[in-house]
Amino acid sequence: MVLVLHHILIAVVQFLRRGQQVFLKPDEPPPQPCADSLQDALLSLGAVIDIAGLRQAAKDALSAVLPKVETVYTYLVDGESRLVCEDPPHELPQEGKIREAVISRKRLSCDGLGPSDLLGKPLARLVAPLAPDTQVLVIPLLDKETGTVAAVILVHCGQLSDSEEQSLQVVEKHALVALQRVQALQQRRPEAVQNTSADPSEDQKDEKGYTAHDRKILQLCGELYDLDATSLQLKVLRYLQQETQATHCCLLLVSEDNLQLSCKVIGEKVLGEEVSFPLTMGRLGQVVEDKQCIQLKDLTSDDVQQLQNMLGCELRAMLCVPVISRATDQVVALACAFNKLGGDFFTDEDERAIQHCFHYTGTVLTSTLAFQKEQKLKCECQALLQVAKNLFTHLDDVSVLLQEIITEARNLSNAEICSVFLLDQNELVAKVFDGGVVDDESYEIRIPADQGIAGHVATTGQILNIPDAYAHPLFYRGVDDSTGFRTRNILCFPIKNENQEVIGVAELVNKINGPWFSKFDEDLATAFSIYCGISIAHSLLYKKVNEAQYRSHLANEMMMYHMKVSDDEYTKLLHDGIQPVAAIDSNFANFTYTPRSLPEDDTSMAILSMLQDMNFINNYKIDCPTLARFCLMVKKGYRDPPYHNWMHAFSVSHFCYLLYKNLELSNYLEDIEIFALFISCMCHDLDHRGTNNSFQVASKSVLAALYSSEGSVMERHHFAQAIAILNTHGCNIFDHFSRKDYQRMLDLMRDIILATDLAHHLRIFKDLQKMAEVGYDRNNKQHHRLLLCLLMTSCDLSDQTKGWKTTRKIAELIYKEFFSQGDLEKAMGNRPMEMMDREKAYIPELQISFMEHIAMPIYKLLQDLFPKAAELYERVASNREHWTKVSHKFTIRGLPSNNSLDFLDEEYEVPDLDVTRAPVNGCCSLEG
């Protein structure tokens, strides 16, 4: 019996202390020297079953853990509610320091008692002053349920160390537990005398007044020393099966939010995965609310089917008894017994046996569950700390960080799928998925920030837990229908920065080990989102710092490569004033004019002439010296690759001028938009290196490091260089603009220059077609944006609208540049595209494909919107026919050599009826 009661004490120590005891854990460090004496003292307290034993055990326990104990008096409440000590018999003083401790309900320490505390000889030895290094402790023990003082212990001992103070706190708690147990046993004995039993042996008392039922339950309590709820359930369920003669018993634990039941143990079997099901279904949920027992006949067919699936056998009988917490008076579990041996149903005696069991073990069960919850929280906190460590080690790459967030969120919540969206202006963008990071912009997911579940969370900033996705009005099930995937439940939570602004949204889909995401998952997600917000914000900040460093590096590189514009240069340019357009060439404003025929030294003046002819200098009151410096600086901002050089920029700018003059753009666009288009044409290829975007990414260049995450690497660099020139002293032609106009001009330039990326053009091509079909609407802002993009692209490809000889020569320049890149790629060990491989490229077919799929559709759209642009489309179509003839000629006569540029030798030219007019600057002879 002593061993059994020792086990009782161990369980009480572990569960009421919620895992704070270290001396029972096998994986903790060895206990301190006083731990053995403390354990013996607590075991003695756990073994008491009467008042006399309690007094002695309390005295022994305090003597074991406190230093220099000389006297211990224990005062217990008697029948008249007085606090009385029996050794020697006397009542607790009604005045003085002892009474103060009782009233305040807190432990009191003093160097001795005063006259009002003394009741003759019993307390005479405690009078002040005491011997040095000694004290009197007045220790009230509080009944937590009633809030009253259940006992008072008076101790004369030495001064306490920190470890002795902790040991005293342990003894206080367990002395109170022992007292409550003794009182419960005293109350139980009269009931045992009154009750009758069918089996006389069950009511037969031993010499201490205990029945067989009492001995069984005491033995069970002695075995409940486990730290985890699973082991405890196994022992309790084994006891219930014996008492009720059931084939199976289980405990259905009620979740904190009262929304689901869970079961981990059935009879002698521990399930591999915890079984959970909603509490809102059937009669089981009513048991939690009504706190009334039910049997099999009370269940719905769905309840029966669910329980049979869980048990794996047919139900013939069932008894369900609610287990109620004494502390909260709420149902914490449902004790279920199934299929009675030798009977068709469970009796009232079985119900009383279950209730009797949990009358004594219910507190241990709730304490164990609370302890297990604390342990779970502890583990989750440790996991969150590890998550924080993992996240903060990936701040250098946002994509890798988001991938880490997805992995950690899925693992923490046991979700099947996780997605993370970042808020980008009015859109939620997902570039990182469970499968990895998406490098191609065309495959990233963009959704409006105010639509769907993620949009709702981003807008409200509140967590959203959806138990049934298909029943929720914000859920779109079209994706499920098309993929065959079934979304059962969703937990979507916001990610905020330090200013509590939403910067992203995380969406968890399908709880793996439960019917839906629980309140615990919500709390965990909320805590997790804090780490996510901090890490993402710092990662973006880190990225900005790196970008600033890259920009600084680029600025230095540009300054080293280019020379500043001297005062002599712009003075010479403006010496004779701005030349009229008509003085340049009589056909300068015609589509047939080829700008490459103009000497390069005259192009800067031609730019000024066009700006003056379009009246931008006067309308915007641009300072001519500033404009001259800007034009010269832009010209110097171009490197000298075969094609993407200043003459290309000049040709593109001239075509913009032609569109303005011949298509009357002022009837379609605002002046500031046309001005932005012209300046963008000048700057659209600034500092071009003769290589494309994919090469920058593959070579891991500085440009790729700076712009690859945003896409359009070179185009973003061109715009950045344009801004750098504007910020150069004496070059800001927009300096006198209002703040609003200045911001709009820069926004227009950014959008127009980015539109020179053909990938961007292909993305908006359907929108352009739709605009051409319905007709241009000047009041539609979207039409303005689309038209500017179309005009920029048509300017960029304007060489294809010139005569055949110009087009052929331009092809030679382009492929020289392409083949140079191909040679670099081969040197890097990469395989270049066919069009960039001088040994494989078949230029005529490549040009035909380019004409048919890119150039002709662009100028066809331009013709649909502007009938006067028909000649441009016709000339592009004519050039396409020339390439067809060249291709046919090569097919008949054979390939000239292994060098693809030999396709463009004069020998293989198609005879042209146009006669040569004049030498072309860096290009060819011109036709009319």
Curated annotation (Swiss-Prot):
Residues binding Mg(2+): D685
Binding sites annotated in the UniProt record for Zn(2+): H648, H684, D685, D796
Domain GAF as annotated: residue spans: 228-365, 397-536
CDD domains: HDc
Cofactor note as given: Binds 2 divalent metal cations per subunit. Site 1 may preferentially bind zinc ions. Binds 2 divalent metal cations per subunit. Site 2 has a preference for magnesium ions.
Example GO BP: cellular response to mechanical stimulus
Subunit field text: Homodimer.
Domain comment, as recorded: The GAF 1 domain functions as a dimerization domain.
Protein name (Swiss-Prot/TrEMBL): cGMP-dependent 3',5'-cyclic phosphodiesterase
Provenance organism: Rattus norvegicus
